UniProtKB/Swiss-Prot annotation:
This is UPF0292 protein MM_0821. SMART domains: TOPRIM. Keywords: Magnesium, Metal-binding. CDD domains: TOPRIM_RNase_M5_like (cd01027). Binds two Mg(2+) per subunit. The keyword Methyltransferase does not apply. Belongs to the UPF0292 family.
Length: 150
């Protein structure tokens, strides 16, 4: 398998996860990130929806407020030490409030990126680089989403 094939497979897997994330967001899921740059990266990737910054309030109060919304919760914190701790703590709080948060997308992105990136804000740049390396362009789903964002 050539490097291009490896990059192509990685790009396909990331785009599948982004599509899954986009569909969840359209159904009303709340996406929890750490910072404003994370939101910007997600929007550049065509993800529209409700984003919440986990770092603006106490985690207990934040989790209680988001849990009271009664919607699906997707935790998309960075995969550095701080992000791992934050994801674990948020998950614990949400479960105490009766909400089972989705950590699968975060965990799969962490695995796929193979330590080439460690945060959500770098995801757009990483995907762009993979597209250049593989000769791919934005797929029509993301082009459509980006057109609405402009």
């Amino acid at each position: 398998m050539t490097d291009v094939d490896v990059y192509r497979k990685r790009l396909e897997r990331i785009e599948e996860l982004l599509l899954e994330l986009s569909e969840s967001a359209e159904r009303g899921a709340v996406i929890i990130v750490e910072g404003k740059r994370d939101i910007l990266s997600m929007k550049k990737l065509g993800i529209k929806g409700s984003f919440e910054l986990a770092t603006r309030y106490s985690l207990f109060n934040f989790s209680e407020r988001v849990a009271s919304l009664g919607c699906e919760v997707i935790i998309l914190t960075d995969w550095d030490r701080r992000g791992d701790l934050l994801a674990a703590k948020l998950s614990e709080y949400f479960e105490n409030f009766g909400v089972k948060p989705d950590l699968q997308i975060r965990n799969k992105l962490k695995l796929i990126s193979q330590k080439e990136i460690k945060d959500i804000e770098s995801l757009y740049t990483y995907v762009s680089k993979l597209r250049v390396k593989t000769g791919s362009s934005l797929n029509s789903e993301y082009e459509t989403n980006l057109e609405f964002e402009r």
